[in-house]
């Protein structure tokens, strides 16, 4: 079987014989040297892809914010199994309509990619189909934008049939407008009537039709899954439903495991949870259902929001939301705003909400952002105040917010009993309002505290 090489020059094969021997001499030279060595060994491990990151922020954006966004993009790349080698930043009033970055920056990226043998370039924004084609033609490596990277991570995380269908639908919707020029054979024609002389149907038309048919099939399948999920949720009548919401990687699954004593997958990576998980919990004879839902993120692809309708219905139909925030993250306030905006988009922003700040054990009020190599045109915010202490934040948020606020550490189990007590009070109050005859031994006095 012929070996296929990707755009970055790496070779992949199903054979256990690696393209390069373990004497650190890669490629054809390494194979020739290995032939002369009967004791030569081969590294059969799958090589991780390497990438550079590219961001085009507004000229007024502070450097600390730009770095924060690139840190998140690097975390996404790491979650997808990619090693990030370098970061490129170009400040423009607006991205170049043809190649997103300017001509000089594109030449700089190309020189670095060729010199280091990089296999992928990842952009922190969505690229148009024409920009994608122009960049691939110029850089001759794989080009990935933010949406495709997130969709790829979702594809690796999805376990249930519903989640897999949702991700596949998002993939096809992303692919459809980008079919032109995707394969070299698309200029050929297929068909042409009985005499084979007509213009026929070009392969691009055929491929588009195949993708559209697949999208229609997946939408029908998801409608069936929605009906099943709706039936399951209807069968949960008579019990209060609570949903954990928040930015990705804030510790929702860890909290879920603590409260429900279950074993939901939790990992220090983005989008560890894609499938929603529901557990029945009872505190002080007050039963309720707790849902762990998919995390939100800045610039979450609209296709994913649309595709994950049935999963997000767990949030829409919840009686109480627990908004979990990673207080150790320097941009946690922006993350709160992103989650609130996404809740508005899915029409769930008007629900009762508890705000829970997690990871207080990792909070550092004097942490300064370290500068990364590869930045140019620095635009530092010299007037930015020092981060407040944890005590100052507690006083501030407890004073200015009407909703209850709690500060915890799920990892270190700090203030978890307080979280249980807070949940119990609010769930019991909702339960008493809706189902006054089903609270068992829980007293009305406790509910009304």
What are these language model-derived features?
Residues 1-146, 150:
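N-terminal accessory targeting/assembly segments
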Residues 1-52, 173, 177-250, 256-257, ...:
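C-terminal-of-GTPase-core extension/linker across diverse P-loop GTPases
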Residues 27-43, 67-71, 94-111, 275, ...:
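Switch II of P-loop NTPase G domains
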Residues 36-37, 234-237, 259-288, 302-307, ...:
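Switch I (effector-binding) loop of TRAFAC-class P-loop GTPase G-domains
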Residues 57-61, 92-94, 126-129, 148-151, ...:
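Conserved nucleotide-binding/hydrolysis micro-motifs of P-loop NTPases
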Residues 62, 70, 74-78, 110-115, ...:
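Conserved C-terminal guanine-recognition region of P-loop GTPase G domains, centered on the G4
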Residues 148-167:
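Short alpha-helix plus adjacent loop in nuclease-associated cores
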């Amino acid at each position: 079987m012929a070996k296929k090489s990707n755009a970055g020059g790496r070779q992949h094969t199903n054979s256990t014989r690696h393209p390069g021997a373990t004497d650190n001499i890669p490629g054809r030279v390494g194979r020739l040297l290995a032939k002369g060595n009967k004791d030569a060994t081969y590294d059969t491990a799958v090589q991780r892809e390497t990438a550079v990151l590219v961001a085009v922020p507004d000229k007024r954006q502070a450097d600390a914010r730009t770095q924060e966004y690139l840190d998140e993009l690097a975390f996404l790349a790491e979650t997808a199994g990619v090693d990030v080698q370098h970061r490129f930043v170009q400040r423009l009033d607006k991205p170049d309509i043809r190649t997103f970055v300017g001509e000089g920056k594109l030449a700089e990226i190309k020189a670095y990619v060729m010199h280091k043998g990089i296999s992928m370039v990842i952009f922190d924004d969505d690229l148009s189909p024409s920009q994608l084609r122009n960049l691939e033609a110029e850089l001759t490596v794989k080009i990935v934008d933010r949406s495709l990277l997130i969709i790829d991570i979702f594809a690796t995380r999805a376990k249930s049939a519903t989640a897999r269908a949702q991700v596949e639908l998002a993939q096809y919707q992303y692919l459809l407008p980008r079919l032109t020029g995707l394969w070299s054979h698309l200029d050929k024609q297929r068909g042409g009537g009985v005499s084979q002389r007509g213009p026929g149907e070009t392969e691009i038309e055929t491929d588009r039709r195949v993708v559209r048919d697949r999208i229609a099939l997946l939408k029908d399948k998801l409608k069936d899954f929605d009906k099943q999920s709706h039936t399951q949720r209807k069968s949960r009548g008579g019990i209060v439903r609570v949903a954990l919401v928040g930015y990705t990687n804030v510790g929702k699954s860890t909290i879920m495991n603590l409260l429900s004593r279950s074993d939901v997958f939790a990992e220090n990576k983005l989008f560890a949870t894609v499938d929603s998980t529901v557990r029945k919990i009872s505190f002080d004879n007050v039963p309720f259902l707790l849902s762990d839902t998919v995390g939100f993120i800045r610039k979450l692809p609209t296709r994913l929001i649309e595709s994950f309708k049935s999963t997000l219905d767990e949030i829409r139909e919840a009686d109480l939301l627990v908004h979990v925030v990673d207080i150790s993250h320097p941009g946690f306030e922006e993350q709160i705003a992103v989650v609130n905006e996404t809740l508005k988009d899915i029409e769930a922003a008007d629900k009762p909400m508890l705000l829970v700040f997690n990871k207080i054990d990792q909070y550092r009020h004097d942490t300064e952002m370290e500068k990364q190599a590869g930045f140019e045109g620095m635009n530092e915010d010299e007037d930015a105040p020092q981060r407040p202490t944890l005590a100052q934040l507690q006083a501030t948020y407890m004073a200015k917010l009407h909703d209850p606020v709690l500060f915890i550490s799920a990892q270190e189990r700090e203030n978890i009993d307080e979280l249980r007590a807070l949940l119990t009070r609010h769930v019991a109050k909702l339960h008493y309002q809706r189902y006054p005859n089903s609270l068992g031994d829980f007293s009305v006095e406790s509910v009304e505290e």
